[in-house]
Every structure is written in C-alpha cells, then in structure tokens.
C-alpha cells in the first residue's frame, strides 16, 4: 500500500513540491532565500492581519491608532516592529535571491524569471503603500513625492495623479485606498509565488555549476530541509535581534511626527530598500527622464536573458564576469548610500556616476565580458 503522502490528492502536491522533489546535489546556501521569502510573506500577512484589527485608515486617527497599537494592545509593539522590520528582511532576502539568479544564470529559466520580476514590482508597490499608512511626516511626504512622479507622463500625468490621490492632494481618500491595496496585495503576491514555484518545478532548480544535473538528483527531504531550517533560524534570529534591540534602526525619525501638509521635512526619502532606485531617479535633472530611469533600473532585469553571451550559464568559472558582478553590488550599495544623502555637492556627481555605471555594467560590460571569456576558452 502506497504512503498517504503519495496518494492523497492534496498531500501529493505538497510531497512533490517539498519532500520528494528531485534536487541538484550541489546547491548551496544561496538557494535558501526562496523559502525564506515564503516565510517572510507568511510572517508579514499574519502580523499585518493583527495590525489591521486595530488600525484605522483615517487621516485624523491613523497616527494615534498606531500609537494605540504600540502602547495599549497586548504585545502590539512587537507585532508592529516585526511587521516593519520584517519588510526589511523581506527585501534583504529579495535582493539576495535576485543576485543569486544573476550570478548563477537562473534568468535563463525565462518564465520563472519574468514572474519573479512581476513579484518584485508587486512587493515594492505593497511596501511603498505600507510605508504611507502610519501617517507620519515621512509617510505623507514620501507618498506625495513618489505619486507626484506620475505627473511627468505627457498629457495624462496630472489627471492620473489626481485619480490616484482621489482629490487634489494626498488626503483621506488616498490613505483609505492605500490601506485597501496594502491589505489585498500580499494575497496576490502569494498567488504569484505559487505560479513562480510551478514554473520552477517544471524545469527543476539550477545549480552552482550551471550544468544539467538531471542524472544525479537527490530528494529534497531530508538533505535540504535541514539546510532550510538552519537558514530560517538564522534569519529569525537576526530579525528578532533587530526588533528587540534596535527596532527603529531602519526607520525614519520623522515618522514619529504626525503628518503635516504645511511643514515639509528638510530631506524627503523613502525606506532604505528603495534608496538605490531613488538615487537613480534624482541623478537625472529632467523629471520624465528620471521616472523612466527609475522604472528601467528594475525593468532592466527583464532583458538580462537577452544579454547573456557566454557559452557557460553560471559565473562560477568566469572571473571577468565575477569582477563585474561584485562591482555591480558595490555600485548598488553606493547608490543606496547616495539616495539617503541631501542633494548637494559631491553627492550629486557621485550619484550620476554610479547611475551611469549601473546601466553600463548590465547593458555593455557584462555581454562584452561573456564574449571575451568565450574567446579565452578557445586558446
């Protein structure tokens, strides 16, 4: 008689996805981040659900309802800080996951990669709307500045911004709809994540060598479940250290001041995980040009499969491409730092140079290095 996990219609799906899944024998810790993202998503949905029970999406009471959650609700403070810092962990795992995909050539699984880009955009939209909800100074002004970027679209820009705002400025209507979208989007993300997994399990996982491992696969459990649990415990430990010891480390002090439309903060900036894109936006003096560069900074991921010129899939044995990859990582860290600095000399020129380098590495240098490496292999 077959085991229940192999014959029950529902348990069978779980079994084929997480237990008996044929997995390459040589995947490293870099393959952990997919499951960590799943855990982050569940954590965010659960903590968000409890926060939504006490939060009110009204401009008059939003700020005080967050204060009420932290002061009066049982363990409200820890739920709120797990949710806020959980978003940061989510993005750390996201960036690592995308970086892993770029390094090991996982972008050649086109369907999985494109769903991943869609997921990235959806998560970014969700995080942005969540940042607006506490209705502090930076929430309000961040929402005003970022949504106002759409006014750069010719002809329909101004009408589009007013339509999103639900009026002539960021106000009650904006906050209410942002809360509604922030609540529903994580469930859409969950559905997209299932599609992402579906496409991945259609092709099987990539591995560090970039060579097919079909003849040599091993079951996911117990070999990789142990590794996943270690990664999970490490991430949860880091998250809880952050939550308990310095919960406001990654936040903005201005958000402890209630939103005031009459008083602009000296330096408006989004959360840290958007700073690299914000720096690219600010590095172009023209408004429409800046918005296009902002969108392209993420959309450029969609054309990476077309820019793959190497005969090898992975960067494991490609030293030139490795140097460029780590230069790209350093460049992104520089952009993140610049995004948090005021718009003045020397930060303006550093931001512009870093933005040019970002696009140059992906569009020009990476394809050239792949071609050079192909030639070197012939020697």
From Swiss-Prot:
InterPro entries per record: Cyt_b/b6_C (IPR005798), Cyt_b/b6_C_sf (IPR036150), Cyt_b/b6_N (IPR005797), Cytb/b6-like_sf (IPR027387), Cytochrome_b (IPR030689), Cytochrome_b_C_euk/bac (IPR048260), Cytochrome_b_N_euk/bac (IPR048259), Di-haem_cyt_TM (IPR016174)
Listed cofactors: heme b
SUPFAM superfamilies recorded: a domain/subunit of cytochrome bc1 complex (Ubiquinol-cytochrome c reductase), Transmembrane di-heme cytochromes
Keyword Electron transport: yes
Main localization category: mitochondrion
PROSITE patterns (UniProt xref): CYTB_CTER (PS51003), CYTB_NTER (PS51002)
Binding residues annotated for a ubiquinone, in chain numbering: 201
Subunit annotation: The cytochrome bc1 complex contains 11 subunits: 3 respiratory subunits (MT-CYB, CYC1 and UQCRFS1), 2 core proteins (UQCRC1 and UQCRC2) and 6 low-molecular weight proteins (UQCRH/QCR6, UQCRB/QCR7, UQCRQ/QCR8, UQCR10/QCR9, UQCR11/QCR10 and a cleavage product of UQCRFS1). This cytochrome bc1 complex then forms a dimer.
Protein name, UniProt field: Cytochrome b
Source organism: Crossarchus alexandri (Alexander's cusimanse)
Lineage: Eukaryota, Metazoa, Chordata, Craniata, Vertebrata
């Amino acid at each position: 008689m077959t085991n229940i996990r192999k014959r029950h219609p529902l348990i069978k799906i779980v079994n084929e996805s997480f237990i008996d899944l044929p997995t390459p024998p040589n995947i490293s810790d870099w393959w952990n981040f997919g499951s960590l993202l799943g855990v982050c998503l569940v954590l965010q949905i659960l903590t968000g659900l409890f926060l939504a029970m006490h939060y009110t999406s009204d401009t008059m009471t939003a700020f005080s309802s967050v204060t009420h959650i932290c002061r009066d609700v049982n363990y409200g403070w820890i739920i709120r800080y797990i949710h806020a810092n959980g978003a940061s962990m989510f993005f750390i795992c996201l960036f690592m996951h995308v970086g892993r995909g770029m390094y090991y050539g996982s972008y050649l699984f086109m369907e999985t990669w494109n769903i991943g880009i869609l997921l990235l955009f959806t998560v970014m939209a969700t995080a942005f709307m969540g940042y607006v909800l506490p209705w502090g100074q930076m929430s309000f002004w961040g929402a005003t500045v970022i949504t106002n970027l759409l006014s750069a679209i010719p002809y329909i820009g101004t009408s589009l911004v007013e339509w999103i705002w639900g009026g002539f400025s960021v106000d009650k209507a904006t906050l209410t709809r942002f809360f509604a979208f922030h609540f529903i989007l994580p469930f859409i993300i969950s559905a997209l994540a299932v599609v992402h997994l579906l496409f991945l399990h259609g092709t099987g996982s990539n591995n560090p060598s970039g060579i097919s491992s079909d003849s040599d696969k091993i079951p996911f459990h117990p070999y990789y479940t142990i590794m996943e649990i270690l990664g999970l415990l490490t991430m949860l430990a880091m998250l809880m250290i952050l939550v308990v010891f310095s919960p406001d480390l990654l936040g903005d002090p201005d958000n402890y001041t209630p939103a005031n439309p009459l008083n602009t903060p000296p330096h408006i900036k989004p959360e840290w995980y958007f700073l690299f894109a914000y720096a690219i936006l600010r590095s172009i003096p023209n408004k429409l040009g800046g918005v296009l560069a902002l969108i392209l900074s993420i959309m450029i991921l969609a054309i990476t499969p077309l820019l793959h010129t190497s005969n090898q899939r992975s960067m494991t044995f490609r030293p030139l491409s490795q140097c460029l990859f780590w230069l790209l990582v350093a460049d992104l860290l520089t952009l993140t730092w610049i995004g948090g600095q005021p718009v003045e000399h020397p930060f303006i020129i550093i931001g512009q140079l870093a933005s040019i380098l970002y696009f140059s590495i992906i569009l020009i240098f990476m394809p050239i290095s792949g071609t050079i490496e192909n030639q070197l292999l012939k020697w």
